[in-house]
């Protein structure tokens, strides 16, 4: 212990960065010197899916009192895991405001509360110049203001979030000029309208549609030079796909139930590696005679295409 105490503060903070935030905070009782060392940590994670109500109340008091006093000039990562409905939206907004004021690089929020739409994201988040990674999971409302610009955002992950109105997602995407990786899971019956992705910088897109979504009038429009595309559509409502401008597409995974599989695949002809899974191949049947050799002129960019079909009494 004496050897550790003799180390410089910078080294002690580095050591604390390798342990959970809760453990790092607990070292503040060791001595006067250790009291505020954890406040120099650049990666913070608070909350747990297994917290009791009393634990969440203690966490709320702790964050209200200590987070505004955090000393690190830059917060590399700030993560909140909130699996309780007792948090007030204004409290969460204040915590995010503090993180944004510290030039945050990564923000991840998980909320398991699926009650009424409550906005827990401050408007300052949508103009954060330093934010590179944004991940929202669960009962988080995406209410995009008119003033939005995320010039550094490269990774955006939206799992089961709620959308304030039609066009919220499109407005956000249009103001992310360097976005490279987009993951969207539509989980509940939000009135999202058209899913439009026109992002020239986007390289990877993963889209999941839950069978619980009400997708009446839903249209998917993709116009972006992707390199990787994954579509998992388990919804039984038929909805059109408008896909174009994917000349750089290298790999694609398509898993659909009721979509027009043939037209969908025909719209991604430049792909090199294609994986298809569907319960319905009725509109995707074509005659095939196995040739002894593959002509050189036959689809020069094509390399492989696993096709999976499940039927009763037959292995895939």
UniProtKB/Swiss-Prot annotation:
<dbReference type="InterPro" id="IPR055411">
    <property type="entry name" value="LRR_FXL15/At3g58940/PEG3-like"/>
</dbReference>
<dbReference type="InterPro" id="IPR036047">
    <property type="entry name" value="F-box-like_dom_sf"/>
</dbReference>
<dbReference type="InterPro" id="IPR032675">
    <property type="entry name" value="LRR_dom_sf"/>
</dbReference>
<dbReference type="InterPro" id="IPR053781">
    <property type="entry name" value="F-box_AtFBL13-like"/>
</dbReference>
<dbReference type="InterPro" id="IPR001810">
    <property type="entry name" value="F-box_dom"/>
</dbReference>
<dbReference type="Pfam" id="PF24758">
    <property type="entry name" value="LRR_At5g56370"/>
</dbReference>
<feature type="domain" description="F-box">
    <location>
        <begin position="1"/>
        <end position="47"/>
    </location>
</feature>
<dbReference type="Pfam" id="PF00646">
    <property type="entry name" value="F-box"/>
</dbReference>
<protein>
    <recommendedName>
        <fullName>F-box protein At4g09920</fullName>
    </recommendedName>
</protein>
<dbReference type="InterPro" id="IPR050232">
    <property type="entry name" value="FBL13/AtMIF1-like"/>
</dbReference>
